[in-house]
Amino acid sequence: MVIELRIKNFLSFKEETTISFEASKDTFKEDSLLVTMADGTRLSRIAIIYGANASGKSNLLEAFEYLFWFWKRKTDDQDAPTGVEPFILDSDTPSQPTEFELKLYINGKKYIYQLILSPKDILSEKLHVYNSNQPSLLMHRELVDSNTALKFNQSLIKVSAAVKDAVSAKCLK
């Protein structure tokens, strides 16, 4: 279940923008509209996005769509563009990275996924997991000197050399 999505420099969003599914203290229709996670976090099952025409409602949904596309895409071309579209109505932002941060629960466990990229390159991708009150880095890839470094937290996830090599061959420069 999604907790929140933060985006920056994506489509019509120049500044950081957040959509949160965390529920308020209101208890109206709590049983049918909310989910309470094991750690006590209350999440709304639904969200309503409203606003004036051309205010970014569709582009906020496009942020979710972009992440799903990014995760599912298959490419044998390690130099393939990322497909991200930064905010273009400012002279500085097209050359600055686009940022995504998705907080979510999967099978009752909290994760934070972070993605920083340009139209050409994936600059950083991180996945944190909460096994306690503090997040632990599970996976990190980043672009260093035009090459991508991929690291797994071996104390949390056992990744064989063969699997790491296969992942590297598929998605790294």
Show where each model-derived region lies.
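Conserved P-loop NTP-binding catalytic core
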Residues: M37-A38, R42-I48, A52, L61-I122
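A generic structural signal for short, non-catalytic loop/turn and secondary-structure boundary residues
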Residues: S12-K14, R42, S95, K120, ...
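Conserved beta-strand and immediately adjacent loop positions that scaffold enzyme active sites
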Residues: E4, E101, S124-K126
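Electropositive, glycine-dotted interaction segments
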Residues: I112-K173
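Solvent-exposed, flexible loop/coil residues
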Residues: T17, A23-K25, S91-T93, L143, ...
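Short acidic, glycine-rich loop/turn motifs
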Residues: I7, L102-I106, V129
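Pre-Walker A-like glycine/lysine-rich segment at the N-terminus of P-loop NTPase domains
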Residues: V2-Y66
